[in-house]
Amino acid sequence: MSVNLDGKLVVAISSRALFDFEEENRVFEDGLAHGLPPGVKPDAAYMKLQLDRLDVPAKPGVAFSLIKKLLAFNEAPDSLQEAQQPAKPAQRVEVVILSRNDPVSGMRVFRSAQHYGLNIQRGTFNRGEPPWRYLKPLHANLFLSAHLSDVRSALEAGVPAAQVYPQSARASQEHPHEVRIAFDGDAVLFSDEAERVYQAQGLSAFQAHEADKAQQPLLGGPFKPLLEALHRLQQAGTSRMRIRTALVTARSAPAHERAIRTLMNWNVEVDEAMFLGGLAKGEFLREFEPDFFFDDQTGHVHSAAQHVPAGHVASGVSNSGGV
């Protein structure tokens, strides 16, 4: 019988999103920028550096905490009763490396994962080629990458995706048994319908539009499928691992009601909702301490990245060429 990933939360992630390869990446970029003798490939110095460091575990990257905690759902028993029995826990989460790295450098990625106890067994290493096309056969629920072009392509293919900011602050260690994820609303969880009104007509028109349509659910945005998948994982429950989600939005009353009613219509719950009315999100996120935050506007992502791991969802009207 063939193996498949049906029923799992599938996260595809690039090596730079999972591990801190920024020093190595600078060597790679230097190879591309400078002329090389005939026959010398631009990634030769990079490959040599990665091979020389094969036994040196890479430092955790911006999405490391998120991945480590999600994988812990595979180790956590479903209930206290199961925790007292030697039964194999359900395998609910699959993490797959999708990398522009070469296969030789891929050895260090897998070895680093093994060092940290991350049970990651699958990956593709495409030596400079975009890896996003492999998201479809994986049926991925999330793709994290440092390459904006790959993120855009994934979003166009209907996969929730975000460009990680490698220099983001790292996640808090205060919640070892709880995955904390924060989402922006418009153009992330929801469609950009309301955001288009705001950008075209201003705040007053936006508030009036949303108050008028409070009973009409918003269409889903690019991250609705991920929120639903996390909700299913949350509902399954374990005796050890939990998920806590937050909606962190620039909306304020009366526009809050349509957002809440939309989630109710989807039969999906979030644990916290912050209606900030344009206040900077960063300090609120610092207090929530998420393992990751997703937003469609780079200004909000930069604000967040000073305090928590953050990623840019290049979708909607706020992003030139967005979907």
Residue ranges and their predicted role:
Residues 116-119, 138-139, 157-158, 266-269, ...:
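Short, structured coil segments at secondary-structure junctions
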Residues 2-9, 19, 148-181, 185-212, ...:
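Asp-based, Mg2+/Mn2+-dependent phosphohydrolase catalytic module
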Residues 121, 141, 179, 271, ...:
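Conserved acidic residues
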Residues 132-133, 282:
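Short hydrophobic/charged patches on amphipathic alpha-helices used for structural packing
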Residues 15, 99, 145, 249, ...:
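Short beta-strand/turn micro-motifs composed of small residues
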Residues 122-127, 145, 162-164, 273-277, ...:
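Short acidic-hydrophobic, aromatic-tinged amphipathic segments that line or gate anion-handling sites
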Residues 2-129, 175, 184-275:
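Alpha-helical substrate-recognition element adjacent to the catalytic core
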